[in-house]
Amino acid sequence: VDEVTRTGVSHVHNVAISGGSEATTFRVSANFRNVEGILQNSGFDQINARANFTHSTLNDKLKFDLNMSLTNRNSDFSFQEALRYAVLFNPTAPITFDNGDYYQAILFDNFNPVAILDQNVNEGKRKNLNFNAKVDYALLDNLTLTANYGQQYENNLNGEYYSRNSLFRGLNRGGLARRYTSDRSFSLFETYATFSQSFSKSNLDVSVGYSFQEDQFEDFFLSLGNFPSDALGYYALETSGDRLSGLA
């Protein structure tokens, strides 16, 4: 197990700027983090940026609120299977031969865990965007009109490549590449009026409005084999023998 694990080291950096005036305030912040997983070849780099803006005018009768955040993450997912095969692997067997080739016992469901991590790639990118804008207008002392719009967006793009020399999924396919992508978006729009009135012993609050929301999702998965070389990994899908022979 020691050959496929490590002491994970992580670091985080933050910076923020804020300011404004009596009618306007703002805050902008950024965050960077690098995280190493305890499994070799696992971890991620992430950058996150946020912006908040508020403004009021017309003697505070009209107020604007704007919030936005953007996150970009690059991940190395590694292979959890390496931990399982590290437990099953013969502890007295070598990891490699003298010529550098990986030792592999010809047994059912038994793979060299170090070879799994060294010969193959499993990584991905994720982007998230969140946006919200809100406007409040005090039409009367006890009547407020509000409009609110928000949107969330997420994109994932993952890639796997199993070497032509990897007994773990790659050898019997002449190299195996997998790509997966997905897009999700969510939109929300609301507009409403709020009436508030206080009486001697009670309060009356009435809200009337309209709300619309939309959720969309689409994804795509591709798996191809029979590659002439491992040099370009999953970036060389056009060279796949499966594709050239009409199998995909």
For each of these PLM feature ranges, what is it?
Residues 1, 38-42, 48-130, 148-248:
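Surface-exposed loop/interface segments of Gram-negative outer-membrane beta-barrel transport/assembly proteins
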Residues 23-26, 135-153, 167-169:
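Glycine/serine-rich loop-strand microenvironments at binding/catalytic pocket rims
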Residues 18-22, 54-58, 136-138, 142-144, ...:
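Structural signature of outer-membrane beta-barrel channels/translocons
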Residues 1-40, 78-81, 115-123, 135-140:
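Residues embedded in well-ordered regular secondary structure
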